[in-house]
C-alpha cells in the first residue's frame, strides 16, 4: 500500500471512529432520552449530565475522548510502516474531529468536540493533553461554565503545542480543530455574553 493510499485509509478510518456518538449510544443503552432532544440539544457529556445521570455522562465523556485517542494512536502506530509523516497524521487529526462534529452514523448531527479533542491531544502528546486538560479544569472550577472552559482551552492548545514542538503540520491541525470547536460554540458564546449560559451540573429535564 502506497503512502498516499495509506494516508487516505487512515483518514477515512479516523472519520468513522470519530463518527460514533457515545452520547447517543450510551443514552440508548441506558434507556435515557436522546440528548439531542433536551437541554442544549448537543450530544455531548455536559448535556447528558443535565439528564441527572452522572454515570451516563461519565461514560459519554470517556467514550468520546477514547475514540479521539484511538483514531490518532492507531495512525501513529501504523504510520512508519507506510511512510506516513506528520502531514498525514495531521489529516487524521482533522478527520477524527470532523467525524465527531458530522457523524455519518447519526445523520451528520454531532457534538461540539471537547472530549474528542482532548483524546486527540493526549494521543499526540501526554504533556500537551495534560496542559490543555489542566486549563479546562481551572476555568471550569472557578467559573462553572463548561463552554467557557472549552473555549479557553481551545485557544491555548495550539500555543501549548508550538511551545513544546514548534510549528509543523500538527500545529496547523490543532489550530484548525480549535477554530472548528470555537465555531461549534457560537450559541454558547452568545449565551455567555447574555448571562444565560447553563452552569456545570444544572439539570434540564428531558421534554
UniProtKB/Swiss-Prot annotation:
Recorded metabolic or biological pathway in which this protein acts: Lipid metabolism; phospholipid metabolism
Residues passing through the membrane, by range: 4-24, 58-78, 86-106, 120-140, 162-182
Domain of life: Bacteria
Pfam family, any one: G3P_acyltransf
This protein's UniProt keywords: Cell inner membrane, Cell membrane, Lipid biosynthesis, Lipid metabolism, Membrane, Phospholipid biosynthesis, Phospholipid metabolism, Transferase, Transmembrane, Transmembrane helix
Subcellular location: Cell inner membrane
Reactions catalysed, as given in the entry: an acyl phosphate + sn-glycerol 3-phosphate = a 1-acyl-sn-glycero-3-phosphate + phosphate
Keyword Cell membrane: yes
A GO CC annotation given for this chain: plasma membrane
EC number: 2.3.1.275
Membrane topology recorded in Swiss-Prot or TrEMBL: Multi-pass membrane protein
BP terms from Gene Ontology: phospholipid biosynthetic process
InterPro entries xrefs: G3P_acylTferase_PlsY
Signal peptide: none
Annotated GO MF terms: acyl-phosphate glycerol-3-phosphate acyltransferase activity
HAMAP family listed in its UniProt record: PlsY
Complex formation: Probably interacts with PlsX.
Role noted for this protein: Catalyzes the transfer of an acyl group from acyl-phosphate (acyl-PO(4)) to glycerol-3-phosphate (G3P) to form lysophosphatidic acid (LPA). This enzyme utilizes acyl-phosphate as fatty acyl donor, but not acyl-CoA or acyl-ACP.
Family per record: Belongs to the PlsY family.
Protein name according to UniProt: Glycerol-3-phosphate acyltransferase
UniProt source species: Ralstonia nicotianae (strain ATCC BAA-1114 / GMI1000)
